[in-house]
């Protein structure tokens, strides 16, 4: 799961379909990134895979955006919070990689999508927002969904579940920080710092985790593709907000669950059981309740 940049002003109705399609493509690329991560973690340790993702992402931004936006990439109003936000995302990336190494793609993605529900809890204490009855209903519903997916007898790895929950908590904190910074920071700056801090953190750790083997040509292509999927996915989702309002795009993020299910079936021959699918639907419903609560609060 990934956090899009701050939404742009409300779009014209004629452009909503374009925004919808851009968001759908971005979410597909996020699912492709997770699929590639899962495949590579079967052959390399997780820190190495995550490091390569951030290195490719950072290089792409430097090559494509730095010549035109050099000052905008690095200039911030609240540098400490920007770096903290990026560091939290590196934790989420590590946790999701460890979870994908141990669990099927769809189930990992579903548990990670508990993040929007957790935001309701974080926002209450950090942003002073009222949770309310609908918010608490969403929180409880989301945890019921996780319990159905991770129930005894599900066959899922216990540590994989722990790491997926850790990723959800980190993602929620990351998104709350994004909201705190939205009023003062440019989307392109926040995106660059996530790539830069991830590259620094995992790049420095890489000598301790690097495995003494040379990647094959297909693996090199996958490493490059993984970073490209993430960077391009963020770009398309950010672009979608120019054409469609947040009220349309926010519920759409759950389309990534569908993409994850399809790719998990096509690539890894893995399909969730009936209880797992039920849990995924319930988690999606909890997130939609949060979106509804947010919309009602604005009116």
Residue ranges, per PLM feature:
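Transmembrane alpha-helical segments that form core, pore/gating elements
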Residues: 46-47, 61, 155-210, 215, ...
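Glycine-/small-residue-enriched transmembrane alpha-helix faces in small-molecule transporters
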Residues: 2-48, 154-180
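Loop-to-transmembrane-helix transition segments
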Residues: 18-24, 65, 70-95, 159-167, ...
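C-terminal transmembrane-helix exit sites in multi-pass transporters
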Residues: 96-98, 115-137, 258-277
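Transmembrane alpha-helices of multi-pass small-molecule transport proteins
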Residues: 2-4, 19, 43-91, 170-173, ...
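Hydrophobic/small/kink-forming positions within alpha-helical transmembrane segments
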Residues: 27-32, 62, 86-94, 116-121, ...
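Hydrophobic transmembrane alpha-helices of multi-pass small-molecule transport proteins
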Residues: 134-150, 275-294
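Helix-helix packing/entry segments at the starts of transmembrane helices
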Residues: 109-114, 181-197, 234-265
């Amino acid at each position: 799961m990934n956090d899009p940049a701050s939404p742009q002003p409300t779009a014209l109705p004629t452009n909503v379909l374009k925004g919808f399609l851009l968001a759908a493509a971005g979410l597909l690329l996020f699912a492709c990134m997770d699929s590639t991560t899962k495949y590579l973690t079967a052959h390399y340790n997780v820190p190495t895979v995550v490091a390569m993702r951030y290195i490719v992402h950072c290089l792409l931004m430097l090559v494509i955006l730095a010549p035109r936006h050099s000052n905008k990439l690095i200039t911030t109003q609240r540098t400490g919070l920007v770096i903290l936000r990026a560091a939290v995302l590196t934790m989420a990336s590590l946790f999701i990689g460890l979870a994908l190494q141990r669990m099927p793609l769809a189930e990992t993605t579903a548990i990670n999508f508990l993040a929007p529900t957790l935001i309701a809890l974080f926002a209450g204490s950090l942003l002073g927002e009222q949770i309310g009855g609908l918010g608490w209903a969403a929180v409880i519903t989301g945890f019921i969904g996780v319990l159905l997916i991770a129930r005894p007898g599900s066959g899922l790895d216990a540590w994989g579940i722990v790491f997926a929950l850790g990723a959800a908590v980190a993602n929620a904190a990351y998104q709350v920080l994004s909201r705190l910074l939205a009023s003062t920071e440019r989307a392109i700056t926040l995106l660059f710092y996530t790539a830069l801090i991830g590259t620094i953190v995992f790049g420095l750790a890489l000598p301790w985790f690097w495995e003494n083997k040379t990647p094959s040509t297909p693996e090199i292509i996958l490493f490059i593709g993984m970073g490209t999927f993430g960077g391009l996915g963020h770009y398309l989702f950010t672009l979608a907000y120019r054409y469609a309002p947040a009220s349309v795009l926010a519920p759409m993020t759950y389309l990534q669950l569908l993409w994850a299910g399809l790719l998990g079936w096509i690539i890894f021959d893995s399909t969730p059981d009936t209880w797992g699918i039920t849990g995924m639907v319930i988690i999606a419903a909890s997130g939609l309740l949060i979106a509804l609560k947010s919309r009602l609060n604005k009116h």
